[in-house]
Swiss-Prot record:
The lineage of its organism: Viruses, Duplodnaviria, Heunggongvirae, Uroviricota, Caudoviricetes. Disulfide bonds: none annotated. Keywords: Host membrane, Membrane, Transmembrane, Transmembrane helix, Virion. The chain crosses the membrane at residues 423-445. This is Putative major capsid protein. One of its GO terms (cellular component) is host cell membrane. Coiled coil: none annotated. It comes from the Viruses. Its main location: virion. Residues 1-20 form a propeptide. It is a single-pass membrane protein. It is found in: Virion; Host membrane.
Length: 464
């Protein structure tokens, strides 16, 4: 039998080019699109896939009443108390009671200024686009301004400034600062329960309010629903063999009335450090942080916080930009009653003056850094800001705001409703800004309550 042998043919360079020629391939650049690939049309789907939040994710901004303002300072009166009640109102037969006046005070709210600026070259609008670039930029600016207003309505702080004068910061005060300090409940990392909601409703009721709404991250609402699954069962069956199980809790009947529950997908987003955010050229230099464990009796750390590295990062914020996060400062806590002292040194070399520092602590479950405090630059002594962490704010927890959402209790003053302003054109591009001027007014601080450090379903996929 003749044995067949496999022989390898050596091809010339010309033959190799002929064999390889006229295959379309996957190249998408002129250098890689040769021969048949040079004839291939590019395909771009005409649908843009949204991978971030949209207007529908905003709840508080959509629900709250907006009132016009006609000055940069809005004034309003608050009725704090009636006249005296009780024994002194009883009199003898021919007597009259002593004079007793009601207690009224005047409050003020300073308007603050929110804007977002966009720029687009003229050529961008002339080419064949799948969507109108100007419409995309305008919609994005409106969404950014609305989201900023909603975030500040919860967490804004007008004292975050290098100026020690009260209210000199750029932000307006939010609910976390305006709510009466006696109306703050600490869940200490536990789940939201019916008892906590009832306790909050009692606080609101003692302020002569009626709680109507509760705003919380969706992770808190989902955890609240999970607690009901073993106590309440709902099975919905169609005409066949299919069944749907589970339910959603949209409201709660408290001791003071019905409370609508709103689960937000974006409420806590700005409280989490985005370490991949691009730094602007005018951003402040990053801070230097030193963490020290100190003896004390005010610490409120939990068992799970002990014997592990507790890690901190700090971001320096100016009017226009944020610094890169500082290097990690860590300490091992060995006693729940102790406290952590952070010494934050602000770099003397900066292009923009720092206004405050944001302090973050690492969560145990996700590994993300959660904001635990913001300290104004006015608190610095010789360039060093000192902060004491006693676990007053726990990472990977959230806030629940419960209160009376009526125009007589809380609303937004609007000096300038949201508008689009064309800016000066100095080159072949179009620049515009979307503006909003106003502030949050909480006329009755005791008619709202805050439940802090509430457990929620934390996720690691927060940022794209």
């Amino acid at each position: 039998m003749t044995e067949k042998k496999n022989t390898e043919r050596q091809l010339t360079s010309v033959q190799e080019e002929v064999i390889k020629g006229f295959t379309t391939g996957y190249g998408i650049t002129p250098e890689s699109q040769t021969d048949a690939a040079a004839l291939r049309r590019e395909f771009l789907d005409d649908q843009i896939t949204m991978l971030t939040w949209a207007d529908g994710d905003l709840s508080f901004y959509r629900d709250i009443t907006k009132r016009p303002a006609t000055s940069t300072v809005a004034k309003y009166d608050v009725y704090l108390a009636h006249g005296r009640v009780g024994h002194t109102r009883f009199t003898r037969e021919i007597g009259v009671a002593p004079i007793s006046d009601p207690n009224l005070r005047q409050k003020t709210v300073n308007m603050k200024y929110v804007s977002d600026t966009k720029n687009m070259s003229i050529a961008t609008g002339l080419v064949n686009n799948i969507e109108d670039p100007m419409r995309i930029l305008t919609d994005d600016a409106i969404s950014v301004v609305a989201k900023t207003i909603e975030w500040a309505s919860f967490y804004g702080d007008s004292d975050l400034s290098e100026n020690p004068d009260a209210g000199s910061g750029l932000e307006f005060d939010g609910l976390a600062k305006l709510i009466d300090k006696h109306n703050v409940l600490d869940a200490k990392g536990a789940s939201l329960t019916e008892a906590l909601l009832n306790q909050a409703s009692v606080l609101v009721g003692k302020g002569y309010g009626t709680p109507t709404d509760a705003y919380m991250p969706i992770g808190v609402q989902a955890d609240f629903v999970n607690q009901q699954l073993d106590r309440q069962v709902q099975v919905i069956s169609d005409n066949g063999q299919n069944a749907t199980m589970g339910f959603n809790v949209k409201g709660f009947n408290s001791a003071r009335g019905f409370i609508r529950l709103h689960g937000s997908t974006v409420m806590e987003l700005e409280q989490i450090l985005d370490e991949n955010r691009m730094q602007l050229p005018n951003a402040p230099q990053k801070a230097t942080v030193k963490a020290t464990l100190e003896a004390g009796t005010k610490g409120k750390f939990r068992d799970e916080d002990l014997t592990i590295d507790t890690e901190y990062k700090v971001v320096v914020v100016s009017d226009d930009a944020e610094s890169a996060p500082s290097d990690v400062a860590s300490v091992v806590i060995d006693d729940k009653k102790k406290q952590v002292k952070l010494e934050i040194t602000i770099n003397n070399m900066y292009q923009a003056r720092p206004q405050y520092v944001a302090i973050y602590r690492k969560g145990l479950e996700t590994g993300l850094f959660y904001q635990i405090a913001r300290v104004p630059a006015s608190k610095a002594v010789e360039g060093v800001i000192t902060f004491i962490d006693v676990n007053d704010e726990i990472p990977e927890t959230a806030d629940v705001f419960v209160g009376e959402l009526t125009p007589s209790v809380v609303h937004l003053f609007e000096l300038l409703p949201m508008m689009r302003l064309p800016l000066a054109q100095v080159n072949a591009s179009v620049t515009f800004a979307v503006l909003w001027y106003g502030a949050l007014a909480l006329r009755a601080p005791k008619k709202w309550a805050r439940i802090k450090n509430v457990k929620y379903i934390a996720t690691g996929n927060v940022f794209n």
